[in-house]
Curated annotation (Swiss-Prot):
It comes from Nitrosomonas eutropha (strain DSM 101675 / C91 / Nm57). It catalyses: hydrogenselenide + ATP + H2O = selenophosphate + AMP + phosphate + 2 H(+). The gene is selD. One of its GO terms (biological process) is selenocysteine biosynthetic process. This is Selenide, water dikinase. The keyword Transferase applies.
Length: 349
């Protein structure tokens, strides 16, 4: 069967980061697991739901380790590979690091899909890994009923320059680098109400690597107190995790949140995923969204795939950071401020 004749999204029930296990379910499971005591060299582990682990090698070098994979979110195999790779690599950038190696994680239904499809998926991933300056060094594959692909990525970072989601400080400005809405837009593709050509802005955004470190001077990099990437738990979920880890409250100017052109159209037409509901269940007790209309309430819970970075920046540097990032991240915007901890983790204005 010729690969161009197969719409990959029609071969799976859920696509992209919308296929994540619901956060409340995942937390309940993990609470029942006895993990060993953390090694003294482990700078960042899973306690604060950060984007990657950090393991200190010496005073100059630490390892950044992460893993991400999912089912197809688009119909084109090569584009799927690019997006899956960009999404996995993003976790390294969210910690302030640089990716150095990547290993593929592949499940593939050999009985129903042509080998040419996986060649294209792997080529897309390989191209994106090379763009990030890393090396594609191998991986593992299994014959499975559903196509799944992603990467295990290792990066390097100076231990003194690590970003985490636990250091946002009162007074900081919040910068978001990419627009929101990939969950509802790709749900439109899966429902065959949209074609890829209708949402090219979102597809290009998902395939773009979050290499903010390449666009900021050392002084501006040092002005970033905390960071996280916005993915499957939506803007609301990842903002809440950053606020909780940092013991602060985020005030979000919701009207400043960048969104893709057709995002509200898709939300109005109920192109939704299960993750819209589970993300709302996860965050609603901990956020104040009373001032938002129905569409914005859906948008903040929209599960992002390969979404942007949310950066907590020294206020004096936020405009300079924004100006530098807009060279590559054109939708980037200042979307809120950080305040001392209040009753709710995130307040949407």
């Amino acid at each position: 069967m010729h690969p161009e004749k197969i719409a990959l999204t029609q071969t799976v029930q859920k696509g992209g980061c919308a296929a994540k296990v619901a956060a409340t379910t995942l937390h309940r499971i993990l609470q029942q697991v006895r993990f060993p005591a953390a090694h003294s060299a482990l700078m960042v582990d899973g306690r604060y739901f950060d984007d990657a682990a950090i393991y200190k090698i010496n005073e100059q070098t630490a390892l950044v380790q992460t893993l991400d994979f999912f089912t197809p979110i688009v119909d084109t195999p090569r584009l799927f590979g690019e997006i899956a790779a960009a999404n996995a690599i993003s976790d390294v950038y969210a910690m302030g690091g640089r990716p150095v190696t990547a290993m593929g994680i592949l499940a593939f239904p050999l009985a129903t899909l042509s080998e040419h499809i996986i060649v294209d998926v792997l080529q897309g991933a390989s191209d994106k890994i090379a763009e990030a300056g890393a090396n594609f060094v191998g991986g593992h594959s299994i014959d499975d009923d559903t196509l799944k692909f992603g990467l295990s990525v290792t990066g390097l970072v100076n231990p003194q320059q690590v970003w985490t989601n636990a250091n946002a400080q009162s007074g900081d400005h919040l910068v978001l680098t990419k627009a929101l809405g990939t969950g509802t837009l790709t749900a439109g593709i899966k429902r065959q109400q949209l074609q890829e050509k209708d949402i090219m802005d979102a597809l290009e955004s998902m395939a773009a690597i979050n290499n903010v470190i390449d666009y900021l001077s050392p002084d501006l990099l040092a002005a970033i107190h905390a960071a996280t990437d916005i993915t499957g738990f939506g803007f609301s979920g990842h903002a809440m995790q950053l606020a909780n880890a940092s013991n602060v409250t985020l005030s979000i100017a919701t009207g400043n949140l960048p969104r893709f052109d057709k995002a509200f159209y898709c939300l109005k037409n109920s192109f939704l995923t299960k993750a819209h509901r589970t993300n709302a269940e996860y965050t609603t007790p901990h956020i104040d969204d009373a001032k938002l209309d129905a569409l914005y309430k859906l948008l903040i819970h929209d599960p992002q795939t390969s979404g942007g970075l949310l950066l907590s920046v020294v206020p004096e540097a936020s405009q300079l950071v924004l100006q530098a990032l807009r060279t590559y991240f054109k939708p980037a915007a200042i979307v809120g401020t950080v305040h001392p901890r209040q009753d709710k983790a995130v307040q949407f204005e």
